Structures are given as structure tokens and as C-alpha cells.
From Swiss-Prot:
Observed phenotype of the null mutant: Cells overexpress discoidin and initiate multicellular development prematurely.
Organism: Dictyostelium discoideum
Domain (Protein kinase) ranges: 1372-1661
Name of this protein: Probable inactive serine/threonine-protein kinase gdt1
Gene Ontology cellular-component annotations: membrane
Amino acid sequence: MKKILLSIFFVVFLLIGSECELIDTPPGYYNLKKIDKFQQFSKIQIERNNKTIYSSSFHDLFYPDICEGTIQNIPGSLYFGRSSFPGAQESSNLMITRGTKMKYRVGNGGIPIYKINVLCIEGTLEIPEGISFFNVGALFILPGGVLNSKSSIRFTDLDPYNSKMDPFNFFPGMMVLGGSLSLIGEKKRIFQATRIDDYQLQIEDFKKIGSLTNNIYLGSKVTIYSQQISEGQTCSFSFGASNDKINLTSSSSSSLRGTNCLPISKNDKNIIVHFNCKYLLGGSSESFIDSTSTVGSSIYITGDSQVQIENFTLDSIGKTTNKLYNDTKLIFSNDKPNQVIDIIKGENQRFRNSLYIEFSNSVVIKGCAIIDRVKESRAPLIFVSSNVSLSESLIVSKSGSNLIAQYGTEFIKSKLNHYFLIPPLPQPFGLNSPINFPSPFSMDYGFEGNGIYSLSPNVQSINDTFISQLIALNFNFIGNRSIITGFDNDCYSPCTNTSILFSNLIQYPVDFKINNSTYFYKLNNNNNDNNNNTNNFNLLNINNENNNNDDNNNNNNSQNHYLLNINNNGNSPGRFFTIKDLVASDTVSAYLPNSALVFNNLNATENFSFNGTVSRLDFINSSFNTNLTSTQKFFDETTTTVTNFQNTYIYGSPETTEPPEKVFGSSITPIYYFSKSVLDSLKVETVYPNEPHKMFFNSSVSLSVKLNNMGLKTPIICIFSSNGMESKEVQYNPISTKCSFLYVSEKLGNHNIRVTIKNEYSKDSSYYFIIDFPIITVYGQSLFNAGWQMIDPTSTTIIPTPTPTSTSTSTSTSTPTTTNNNQLVNDNNNKINELDGLKFQGGCIKTLGCQLSSNAKYVGGLPNVTASSTLNSLFSWGITSDVQYDPVIIDLFINKSIATLQVQLFFTFYKPIDQYSSPLSVSIQKNPVLVMEPFAGDQPFSKNLTFVYNNTQSLDFLNISFTSRGDIYLTSLAIFSVSDSLPQIIDPITPTLLPIESVKASKPAILAIVLSIVLGSLALSIITILIVKHRKRLSQFLSKSNKDIEYAQNNEIEIKVLPKITSHSSYPSISILDTISSDSIFNNQIPKNNNRYKFKNQSLNNNNYFNNNNNNNNSNNNNSNNIIYSNCNSNYSNSNSNNNNNNNNSNSNNNSNSNSNININSNSNSNSNSNSNGNNNYQIYSNKLESFKIDEISNDTIPIINSTFPDEFQTLEFQKLAFEILKREKRLDFSFRTTNDILTCCALSDFKDFSNFPLRFNQSIITFGLINGKAKLGETYYDTLSITNDSTIRFTAFLILPMDNHSATFTSDHSSFDLGPGETFSIKFSITLHCTTRFFENFSIQINSNNIKEMYTLLKIKVESESSTRLDFNDIHFQELIEKYSWEILYRGTVGDKNALLKLIKLKTKNCEEAYRELNIISRLKHQNILPLIGCVISKDYLCLAFEYPPLGSLDYIISKKKLKMSITQKIRILIDVAKGCKFLQQSSIIQKTLRARNIFLYDTNENAEVCAKVLDLTSSKTIKGLACNNYIERVDTPINLTREISIIRDPKQNNDFNNSNNSNNNNNNNNNNNNNNNNNSNNSNNSSSLKYNIHSFAVLSYELLIDEILVGDTRKFGQEKPSIGLDKIDPNIKNFIHKCWNPIDGFTFNEILKTLKDFIESLN
């Protein structure tokens, strides 16, 4: 017999822990009790017009005091009979008292079951199988009461002589107020059948039952449901020759329906059979609940009740109809607040349904038939704020909905259910009808004819079947519902200032979970095969506004049928709606003018098309496999602002699938394919550019399409075409698997480029793919027109700006306290500076040219988001909306005579509201130019957006607005005019978006833009391309010495010579830079890197322009083997100058033969005195040549962030914590080395595309023979490059290698060589990888001759390492500080693109070996409940460990911040995972010293998930052997609650065993068998000593989780009294379990703990 559920694990908030108010009523009525159902939730006090408004109608529960005056049982009674209740008569009112356990039986004085009027249960009643009916008028389960029934229950009318009136119409029926209800039927009654013929069905499940089928279902009748008979028909039947077939009794007369059957339609694909044994005396009885009451009955469950209903039938017991709710109203006395003087009884009381459940976290309904077809009800099932699992059930109703999921019901799981609906008749809903426009106060929803009506998007529908509904799944989102619920963290609709709700900023994206559900509907009720229509995910309606805007939206008055309807209820702003894995074969319609709709993995087939209105429409990883004609288009009826295709294939011609109108922000890159078979052999992997691209006049961009050829043998060509160029054929390169084309911008304006990929030999119009690239916009040079730095004019902060002059453009800023006459922002006097007649303004001052909406909020102290201190100063202030999603509006003065303007905006993303993306929208002159662009990330970053506006109306002011959630800040704004001397722009678009990704800071116009903002300089910044003069031949310098070197070139790079670097670092660590002046080797040779630049590759196709100004380079070099590089254009990010004079004086004193100087000029003013002792081994070092980069934090600094939880994220602070990678052996080569930036700069083209390059190479990519393999760490690989001179000229060649770094060592056996005509020279390369890395680098070869200028080419190295735990420190990023201990620091951060838990351990003499040993241990820990180690980096002073970081964070965070409301089942499931992890550690001889909530991390709260929680071993653990050998425990943050366990480990009686075991291990290193034996002996010794290391900690953890509180102070100590607070409200078995674990000596082992917890789970299920 199944174990009886005895307990309630959560705090019961009804009646227990709070007193109920007693309400007196007029004579004839039951007195009432009043409680606040929402008292466990925080109240939301809303004020409007200085009045507090609050609706208590839904919060307050009034229920009749029906148990008053009942007859209580005799204490200790075991059986439910007349003798157990003294004085009980027929129709008595009875009470089973608390602590009494009774079993129902008839006879021996038992009360007849049809004579119970009222039964109240505080104890336990068990009704066994075999009872025909348990008749009762009112069944009331009070807090703590338990009813377990395997027999049927029938509700009857209340005895008028022994009852009063119930004003709220709960009874007749059942009310459960915080108790436990278990209704378990023994036999399955619902089966899916297959039609064989008109009167024969096959039931596959009967094959499993076999010959017992006849006995189980003997004498039954069947009720058959299908899409043609959604109301069902009851038939007699007999078994066929085989037990899996049933024969129906036929009749030609429909009047015999109910005893015989009409034929089954051949079009019925979904047939459900319900074996109905309800009224039969023979055969197996059915377990059901029904009603004979003349006024109806209902089941009302609340108060965190435990509910389990299986294999039961609920037959037509609901009361609430599908008309307007009409609730009972109480008229209270003015003098006595608890006295009701009159009652207006409601005619249609809400929530009196077949089954209404609220505030219950453990509800299981399985295999049930819920029938509600007597009258039009609102819904047979309604759930509010509950966790419900509904599966394998049949729900049949003549109602507004089969199921309504109200507020807070976020965890409903509907799986394998069959929903049949007789749609309601059209209601006379007019424009003024409240049912047509649901009020949030009435919750009058779900009347339309739905399968599932939900106010929560998290309702899951998996493999469900919906029959005959008007809308299978109807989702409604209401922004002001918290006024009713009181949920302080419940805001699925946007929370705006126009909503009633203010308390919560969280805006969840909506991700619908609809997997493989099926929808069938019929056009009418005529049983005609031709009238049946089957839709499998094929009609979708999404609505964003109330129905009063369009009468046609009223689904009750139309024959439209939808699988999914989404109504955003007119809320603005909108949100992201995501639909995954949808298969659509017909029209999809949406009306979401304020929202974004994303289809992910859409499979569009047959007649699919999309129509409606959405703000943003995205198709991701989708395919359109439809047969389109020239007149049929996907988007004929679509209105959208932005349309995005990402990796999406469309079958058909592009001319038939043109997307609708869109702003420039649209990413239109669909992939059209001609033949469905082509996808089996050829696919498109990547397209570049894959987003709108910006470029400047006469510049170039490399267009490319990468293909995945899976067996296509024919040659492929790619034809590039555009409105701005002639078509160009490009041969597909099978080696790079790309088609690449260098596109040169020769016209201004917007260019639509298309590539057609086809068979080279095909002469017809057939093709493989046609791809439209995103729009490419070509701009010209610009003049600064107006700007605005977002600093609060009321602030006392002064942003200084240096004086702009014609001879200096230094970007360094003055100190914050400096003032000068040319300061752009001076908030003391609100001064506006005019330079050359142009204005630059700080703050917004109406009288001086700009206006700002009053809702703008100034925010200072924004974090550094670039590598430039100047830009960081500029971006330190920003504005955002004071109310989220409220647009910030800016009116800025412009010159109306200028026709074309460029508008540049800088935004900083900082302190995200939650873990979801934050959308940004931008409009210019109220026209959208950026729509709901998602910003997301854990770290602050900056984004530059540049737009084009054509001022055709000659406006004086430009209106710019943006909206966000309040976590995106506009930090600066500038407007530029396009030069009139440039050609006319073609195809203007107003306005036009230009994202930052396409902006190259090295371009002259961007320099003008950024530096004009930074310096406030309004002077002309036209960047000219300087003509580079020919330098003297290199041979002249090699043959001469001690002679001044003259430079006539303007654009050159200074590359300084350094001694060969022998550490892993590719650039100096902070510790080196900060002490550079005291280092004689590095003195005056390493340029100061104040901005902490990181190295980054630059595009090969980008031409960099730079103007030097007054560069005086005095170099005294005493070096050898020096070379001069020239003709190399480059640029520093924060420099801009006009070259006037360039005097370079170099004096060289050489102490060796054949000496020459290396001195390549740069833009920086520098005096370099280089002294060396004649060492021939040098490498080249350069300053970083890059523009500022988003999220630039140097790898040699680690952030210290004073934050524990994500929602307490504070301003970044940085600590100079040098992380110097360990040194390795010196290189043997003496190569010239520099960074990839200089290599890219110097190499003017790839040799394969440079037809004039005279050298030929045997390979272009050095792979070291690892094309299809990966390199092992620490192993050296070799490769040879053969170079052949195909010309008639002798060349001198120089090899320039990339800089060494800690991830790899790359060397060559030669640094230079001579190569005569026809000669071949070989260079041997070697590489050694030191960590998990992808060493994809470039190296350059420069050749020189007496007859021609020097030439460059670029080759590549591509080597990837095998996976390991040794990480590349450049991939590790530190974010927020979690904990700091005496010798270790714990961070949250990332490793690559993965979230990680990062731990720094100080490596000192006393614990260095300890750390290595623990690293070795942790790397071997592989268990699903142990937080896995990603890898590590070892430096000179630190060991950095990276662990996997789970998505839900730590248990401590969830408990302390009340982030999740978990059921008892979920909590026990988490404890099981923790126990599994601890058991594994114990078996591995590891003591987890930090077992507490902060070291338990959650992955999932679904109790059916494979893994819910993992234990983090913070490497404070010690092996047992290590503890005994060292005979001490490092007490670093040792938890207080482990004191007792440590004393057990230190037990002297055990030390000898440990020491002997360890000594034995140490003395037998040469004998593996002895070692193994000794290890086993040690483990046996450990087991025999019964050390229960973490039991007490586990008890504390369990206690904290169950009571939802984190213990502090002495309450955690071992030796304290066993806990009692909160335990009196949970199951006594759980309480005993915690008490037993509280003492680790007498407690369980983890094996026993797991068994106990699994027993708890089994009892709950």
C-alpha cells in the first residue's frame, strides 16, 4: 500500500502563523473567516493623485466557518464510523481532529455514506478502494488535514435543517485550505485509438495488458472523442478476436446516441477512448468525483496544499459559467468593521470550477478525465500561482477555455494531454462590455474558446493535442496585474509609468515553449468527412493591441482558428517574442507594432506566408521550403521596420520574396537556393560583411562567402554585382573554401551588392545560391558642425580640454582641476565656446542652441570603456531616461544650409537591470533608425552609432530621441556635414544607420569625428594622403656607418630595438612598466604605455593614414644588425596632426663590423638613446597601433569589484596586480620581431593576390604538418618554407616574425638572406605551444634591391593546440569580486565566451606545493555534481583556477535574495545532488571544508532535470593523506560549523594509520603494486574509522534551504542546540533527519543520506 503523505513542507500561511479575522453575518448565513492569501508576498503601495489605491478583493479570502459546531471524533479512534463520533446522526456535521488517523469502513455502526452533511478534516482520513460512493455535502480539509481516497466521491445538496447559507458558494463541494489531497484511481481509463473501420478501433496499449483486458474493462462503456465529435459519444462495445481491438455497436439512427454509436469518420486522426465504468455494478468500478447537487459543486484548493490526482474522473462539477463574473458583495457596518449587515449574493462567483488551485507548489494531475460539458463554463481548470504538472489527461469542456493559467503560474507543464472543446456561442460583447476588455481588477479572462489561456509565457505545451478550439494557446500580457496579486517580482508585461505597477524593473523576454503540439479543428459540426481541416502548427495570430481598435479582432465572431495567439494588450514598449522549432504550412499573422518577433529554427512549408505588423522581425537558422510563383510573395501584407535574416535559406527566386520596407539597420542576408537538392551537397557557412557596412570614398572592403562543399564536383564561380559597379566573376577557391572580391568604393551613397553562386559551365539562369549582402554605404570627408558632451550643467565637475592649435593635436587631457580660456565645458559659468564660428556645448542650455526633455537623467562616474584615458574622460558622463522606456528627446541646432549630415552617437552600456538583453531604439526626426537593438553582457562597453540625415526641409534643429531600459547611456553626440566638394550622393536614404563595427578608427574622417569631440576643436580636420618619397636604397645604409640618416618621409613608424625577451609576456607587465626607469636594460627603450593597450589584429585591406608633426628623433645607437623600415603608413588612435617639419637626427657609434641603424620614424615626439653591449640578438618592439576598443581592460591588471551579488554591481576599481607569466628558456634565433599590427601595416598585400611580387613560396600557411590535427603542449614542431626567386634581380630578404607571447614560442633559423635569380632558399621554423591556444599569426618578408623599392608580403602561421587545463591568460577576464581570503581571491569572470568562477591563489613557499597538489586532484575530479575545472594559468606569484559558472548562481544568493520560490520537491532534489557530490568527494578521500550555501551552485530548478546543483570544491579541501602528512589544517575562512569535524580528523588515534599509509606510499615509489595496495589500505582505514566529514555542514545547509534563511553567527556552530526555528512547520521526518545529521558522529553516511532523501522524493511523487 502506498505510503500516506503526512506532511506539509512549506510554511502554511493560511490560519497558521497568522490569526484569521472572524466576520459576523446576518442571520441564516454562516459566519465568515477572512485571511489575506497574499500575505507571504510583499505589498505594493501605489499612489495616484496623493491617494493610495489598492484592490483587496482578490487578496482577501472570505470562507464560511462551516466547521463551527461540528461533532468531533473520540480521541484515538481508528475507524470512520458512527461509534467514533458521539451523538452523530444522519446528516451530521463531523470533525476529524488533528492527530487522528482514521480509515473509512462500512458496518459495525458505520455511518451511511449518504448521510454526511459536513465533514471537516484536521487529521487523516483514508478511503480505500471498493467503496461505491462517498456522499458528502461539504468536504473541508483544514491546514494539516489529509484525505487519501481510492474510491469515488459524490457531492450532494447540503441538509437545509443542519446547514446555513454559504454566501460565497463554496459548497456543496470541496475546499482544501493548506492540507493534503490524494485521489488515486487504480486503473488507467484513457487510451489513444486508431480507426480500423467505421465501427472498429485498435488500442495499442491493450497489447501490453494482454488477456487481462476483458476482466479489467468487462461491462464498461466507452466514450469516444475526436475532432468530429469533440463533445464525445458513449457507445457499447465488445472485444475483438484480439484483445487490442474493440467493436462498437452500430445504429442507423442518431436518436440512439448514448447507447449506440455513429460511424467513426475516416478523417478522424486523433481518437481518444475513455472507458466509463461509472454506473456499472459488474466489472471494475471507476474512481470519480461527481455531483447530484441541484446548485452544482466545485473544488477550491489554496494555502500551499499538496495535491495528487491520478486516474480519476471529474465529471461536470463546476459552477462558474462563461458569462461575466458576478461576485458576492459584503456590506459592512460603519460602526463595526467586522460586522456584515447585508449580503448581495453573486450570480456567477468566480473560480468555482471543476478544479481551482492556487498557491500550491506541488500539484500532480495524471491520467485524469476532466469533463465539463453540461453547460458553458468559464473553464474546468484554473490555476493561480501554482506549480502544476498536468499529463496524459483528457480535458473536455463546453467552455471559454479548457485551462486558464492565471497570475504567477510560471511552472505549468502540460504534456501528452488531449484538449477537446465545444466552442462557446458568440457573446453579445459590445465596445462597452468589460468582458471584451478585461479589467486587471476583475481577472475576467479566458472566455474566447481557448485550449490554454495563460497570463504567463512559461507554460509549457509538449506533445499536446488541441481539438476544435478557436485558439489552441492564447497568451495575454498585462502590465498592471501586480495591483491585484501583490507580487513584487512579477512583471511579464512591460512595467512603465503608465502601468499601475512600479516596483519591478525586470523585463523578461518571452520564449514560448511549444514542442510538437498538434491542433485540429473542424469548420462546422456536421459529421461530413469533407468538412474536416487539420492544422499542424499552421495558423498563427499574434496581437499587440486591445480589440477595441478593430472589431475584426474579436475571435468569437469569426471562423478564424489559431494555434497560437499573443496579445500584448497594447502595452508599450514591447518586448521580444521568440518562437522556436515551429513548423508552419500556412499563413502566419502577427500584430505587434511595438515588439519584436523572432522565429528560431522555423520550418516553413507548403503555402507559408507572413502578414501583419511588427516592429522587428527576425528569422534565425530557418528554412523556407515553399513553392513560390511570380505572383506569390512571402511578405505581401507585412509592415515591419526592421527585418533580419540570419543563416536562413529561401527556396525560390529573390524577386518573389522581397522583404518589406525597412530602415538601414536591417540585416537582409537571406540565402536563396534554386534546387532543394543543392542543400545536400553545398551550404553557405559565413558571409562578410554580415551587417550594414560603412566605408569611405575610394577605400575598399573584402567581400567574401565561405562555402561548405560536401561533395559537389563541378567548378564553382561567384558573380558579384551592384548598382555601383559592373559584374565581376570570381573563381571559388577550394583551399580557402571562399569566394572573395575586393570591392572599391567609387561612388558615394548606398550600394546593394549581390553574389550569385553557380556552376561555372552553366549557361542558363540556374544557380546554387543568391545572397544579398547588407547595404554598404560610402561616405566622404566631413566637417564638424555641432556637438554635445553629456555632462550635467549643474555639476561642479570641470572637463578640461587642451587648446587646439594648428601645430599640435595631442590628445592628452589636463588634470581635472585645470581651467583655461578655451575650455569647451565650464560649468561654473555655463560658458559656450565658439571656435572658428562653430559651437560645442556641455550640458543642455535652452537659450544657447539645444533642448533636452525633462525626463533625462544625468549620470556621472561611468566606468572606463576604452583604452584611452581621453575618451574615458569624455564618456564619464551620460544621460538616460529617468523612467525606463520613456524616450529621451534632444533638439540640437544645425546649419540648415547643409543638405547632408552625419549624426554620431556614443552609448555606454552599464549596470544591466537583469541577465536579459536591453533593447535600444533611436529615432531622427521621429523616424526610426535603430529598432530594439539588443545590448547584453556582463561588462560595461561602448558603442558608436553613425547615421546619415538628408536635411531636405532645411531644418534649423534636429530632433533625436532614444529609448532604453535605463541601463544604456548617451555619452556624447556630434553632427558633421559632408563636404560640398565631393560628388553627389546617390540613392539617399533618410535616415541611414551605420553601426560601429564598420567604423575603422584609422580612417581620416573618423579621426576628425572622434578628435573633434574629444578636443572640441572646430578647426578644419581634413585628412590628406601624403605622397611618400622614395628612400635611399637599403644597401647604401648597409655599406655606410657613422653617418646621419635623413628622413624625407612623413608617414613612418618608429620601431625600437630591444634585447631578446625571454618571458612569456608579449608586452611588459605592470610591474615592469612601473619600474622601468630603474632598469638599465629597458631604460629609454620601451615607450610608456599609459593607456594599457592590448594587441589586436587590423584588417589587411584598410589603408591607414597618418600625419606627423614636428617629430625630432635623436637616436644614439650602439647596436649591430640594424635595419631601417619605411614606406609604412600607420596611426596612433588618440593622435591627429598636420605635418609641418620632420627633423630626424641619428648618431651611431658602432663597435662592431657591418653595423647599421634601425630607426623607423613614428608620430610620437621621442628622444631615444640606446646603449647595448654589442648583443646581436634583438627583437622589435612597438607601441600599440589601434583605435580605442570596447571593453578594453589590460590583461596585466585585475579588477577589484566590491560586489557580492549581480544586482549590487558597483563602479569598477582596478588594482595593479601584476600577473607575470612564468619564464621559459631563451630563444636561439636572432630574428626581427614586431606585432601583427605593424606586420599588417608593412605588408601591402597578400602575395597570392600581388602579381608583381617576384618570390614564389611552396606554401602560404605554415601549419607544421597539423592541418587536420592539433599540437600537443610542450612539444616542438618543425616546418620548412622554400622561397624561389622567379625574377632576374638579386634581392636581400628580411624575415619579420610575430612577437613571442606566453602561449607559444615561434622561431626561425634565419633572419635574412640573399636570393639570386632562379635561386631557392629554405627557412626552418619551429613552434612550441604552452597552453590551450590558437596560434593564428602573420609574419612578413621584406625584399630590397638596388633597382626597385622595397616590397613586402604577408604569410600566415596556423597552429591550434589540443584541449588542456592550461589556459591562455588573454582569454581570462575578471569581473566582480565574490570573496577574498588571506591567500586566495574569488572572482566571477569569463574564459573566452564562457562564464567562469575564477580563483587566484597566492603561491608562496609554504603552500606552493600544496596548491600544485590540489590542482592535480581537482583536474581529476569528474562527476556530474562537482563543479568542473575549466583550466588554470600559473604565474610567478599566482595560480589562477577557472571553474564552470552555472546560470542560476549560488544557492546563498538565491536564498538570501529570495530570487526563486521553490517547492519542497525541488529543494529535496537539490539536496540529493549535493549529497551525491559530497559522497564522491568522500570516496575520493577529499574533505570539502567549505560546504555551505555559497559554494552550492544551481543549474536547474526542474526536479526532473539531470543535474540541478553542483558542489564547488574551493581548493581549501585537503586530501586525508595530505592532512596526516603535514599534520595541520590551514585555517583560512574555516566555516564555524566544521569545528567538530576538524577535531575528528585530528583524532590522534587515526594519525598513525594515516602516517603509516603515507610513509608506505613514499617508500615504494618503484613498486606500483605496493603503492596501490597501500592506497587501498589507507582508504580502508578511512572507511573503517567512519569519518563523517561534512555531515554537520550538510545538516546546516539542509536547514537553511528548507526554511529559506541563511544562518549567521553562533547559530552555525557545532555543539549548539539542535535547531528548532521553522522546523515545527515542516514534516517531522525531515526534522528528525536534520537533527540526526546535526551530530556528525551519530549521523548518517552520505549513502544513508541519499537513500533517505530519495525516499522523500518517492513519497512526494
